[in-house]
C-alpha cells in the first residue's frame, strides 16, 4: 500500500475582459493571421484594474472546492504557482488562504514561471505522500498582463491572465500504475538559459517590476527536446506510454510547440487538449485551466490517465502522470 494524491475536483477562473487579435492589431503592428499562424492564439483574457492574482486564485479555488464537494476547512495545504504575486511579500497564497476563510495549515507560493503548476503539483504530492498534510489545494494563477511591454509585438500577443486549481486528497492505494492519483512527477531546470526568458526587473536588482523579455527562437529551439525528454522519464517510471495514456494536457504556450512535442512522442492528435486559442499563454495557470475545460466538456473522466507537461523561464520544465 502507498499514499497517492487523488484529484477530487478542479476549477478555474478567467477575467471577464477578452482581448482579441483584432484589438491588438489596432494598437500595434501585427495581424490576426500573423498571430494565429505562429502561435495558434486567437484571444486572451485580461484582468480588470484592481483585479489581482489573489482574486483570480480565490475564484478558481472556490470552483475546485465546489467541484470536489469538500469543506474548505478540510484543506491543510495550499501551494500556489505564480510569477505575478500581489506583493513581493507576503505570499499570495496566504491571501488566498484568508480569502477562503482557512486559518490553519500551510500556504506558500512557488515560482517556476510557466512550469509553476507542475512544480506546485509535485511539491504538494510529496507533502501528501509523506503524511505531512492530508488535503491540498494546488493553484496556478497569473496576471501576466501586468508585466508585458504592450509595444513589443513579439511578446504582448502571447500572454493572458487566469487561474486554475485542483483539490488533492491523500488516499491509500495499491502502489501500482493502476492507482488513482498522481503516479509520478519529474522536475528539471538549467540556469544556463536564464537570460532567454526573463523579466527585466525585481526588488533586489532594479527595485521595479520590469517587463517580460524573450528570445523566442531560442525558447522554441530548446522546448521540444526538453519537454519530450522529461515525458519519456515519466513513461519509464510508470510503464505507461503514448498509446496507453488517455489525454495529453500540455502547457498552452504555442500550438506549434505542442504539435511538435506530440508528434515526436507519437501521441495521437485527438488525445491533445488545446486551449491556447482561447486563453493564450497563461503561464502557471494554463494547465489547470485546460484540465478544467476538458473535465467540464466530458473528455476527462474518472480513471483516465492524463499526461501533463510544462516548460518555462529559467529554463524550468517538468512532467506528471495522473490517473483521474
From Swiss-Prot:
Biological process per Gene Ontology, one example term: fatty acid biosynthetic process
Biological function: Catalyzes the condensation reaction of fatty acid synthesis by the addition to an acyl acceptor of two carbons from malonyl-ACP. Catalyzes the first condensation reaction which initiates fatty acid synthesis and may therefore play a role in governing the total rate of fatty acid production. Possesses both acetoacetyl-ACP synthase and acetyl transacylase activities. Its substrate specificity determines the biosynthesis of branched-chain and/or straight-chain of fatty acids.
UniProt-listed Pfam families: ACP_syn_III, ACP_syn_III_C
Subcellular location: Cytoplasm
Gene3D superfamilies: 3.40.47.10
Catalytic reactions on record: malonyl-[ACP] + acetyl-CoA + H(+) = 3-oxobutanoyl-[ACP] + CO2 + CoA
UniProt similarity note: Belongs to the thiolase-like superfamily. FabH family.
Family matches, as HAMAP family: FabH (MF_01815)
Quaternary organization: Homodimer.
Keyword list, A-Z: Acyltransferase, Cytoplasm, Fatty acid biosynthesis, Fatty acid metabolism, Lipid biosynthesis, Lipid metabolism, Multifunctional enzyme, Transferase
GO MF entry, a single one: 3-oxoacyl-[acyl-carrier-protein] synthase activity
Pathway participation: Lipid metabolism; fatty acid biosynthesis
EC number: 2.3.1.180
Active site per the UniProt annotation: 114, 251, 281
Protein name: Beta-ketoacyl-[acyl-carrier-protein] synthase III
Keyword S-adenosyl-L-methionine assigned: no
GO cellular component, one term: cytoplasm
Annotated segments matching region ACP-binding: 252-256
The species this protein was found in: Bradyrhizobium sp. (strain BTAi1 / ATCC BAA-1182)
Domain notes: The last Arg residue of the ACP-binding site is essential for the weak association between ACP/AcpP and FabH.
Superkingdom in the source lineage: Bacteria
Matching InterPro entries: ACP_syn_III_C, ACP_syn_III_N, FabH, Thiolase-like
Broad enzyme group: transferase
Amino acid at each position: 500500500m502507498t499514499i497517492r494524491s487523488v484529484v477530487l475536483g478542479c476549477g478555474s477562473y478567467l477575467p471577464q475582459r477578452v482581448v482579441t487579435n483584432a484589438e491588438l492589431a489596432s494598437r500595434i503592428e501585427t495581424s490576426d493571421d500573423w498571430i494565429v499562424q505562429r502561435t495558434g492564439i486567437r484571444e486572451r483574457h485580461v484582468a480588470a484594474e484592481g483585479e489581482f492574482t489573489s482574486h483570480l486564485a480565490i475564484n478558481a479555488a472556490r470552483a475546485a472546492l465546489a467541484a470536489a464537494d469538500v469543506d474548505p476547512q478540510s484543506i491543510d495545504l495550499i501551494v500556489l504557482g505564480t510569477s505575478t504575486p500581489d506583493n513581493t511579500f507576503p505570499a499570495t497564497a496566504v491571501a488566498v488562504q484568508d480569502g477562503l476563510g482557512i486559518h490553519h495549515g500551510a500556504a506558500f507560493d512557488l515560482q517556476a514561471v510557466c512550469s509553476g503548476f507542475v512544480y506546485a503539483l509535485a511539491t504538494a504530492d510529496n507533502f501528501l505522500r509523506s503524511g505531512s498534510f492530508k488535503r491540498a489545494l494546488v493553484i496556478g494563477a497569473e496576471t501576466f498582463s501586468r508585466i508585458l511591454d504592450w509595444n513589443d509585438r513579439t511578446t504582448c500577443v502571447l500572454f493572458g491572465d487566469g487561474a486554475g486549481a485542483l483539490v488533492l486528497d491523500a488516499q491509500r492505494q495499491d502502489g501500482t500504475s493502476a492507482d488513482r492519483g498522481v503516479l509520478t512527477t519529474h522536475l528539471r531546470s538549467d540556469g544556463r538559459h536564464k537570460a532567454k526568458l526573463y523579466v527585466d526587473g525585481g526588488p533586489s536588482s532594479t527595485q521595479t517590476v520590469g517587463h517580460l523579455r524573450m528570445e523566442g527562437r531560442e525558447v522554441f529551439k530548446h522546448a521540444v527536446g526538453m519537454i519530450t525528454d522529461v515525458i519519456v522519464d515519466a513513461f519509464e517510471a510508470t510503464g505507461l506510454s503514448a498509446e496507453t495514456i488517455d489525454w495529453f494536457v500540455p502547457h498552452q504556450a504555442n500550438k506549434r510547440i505542442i504539435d511538435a512535442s506530440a508528434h515526436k512522442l507519437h501521441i495521437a492528435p485527438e488525445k491533445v487538449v488545446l486551449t491556447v486559442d482561447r486563453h493564450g499563454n497563461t503561464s502557471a495557470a494554463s494547465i489547470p485551466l485546460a484540465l478544467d475545460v476538458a473535465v467540464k466538456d466530458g473528455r476527462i473522466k474518472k480513471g483516465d490517465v492524463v499526461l501533463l507537461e510544462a516548460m518555462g523561464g529559467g529554463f524550468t520544465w517538468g512532467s506528471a502522470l495522473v490517473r483521474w
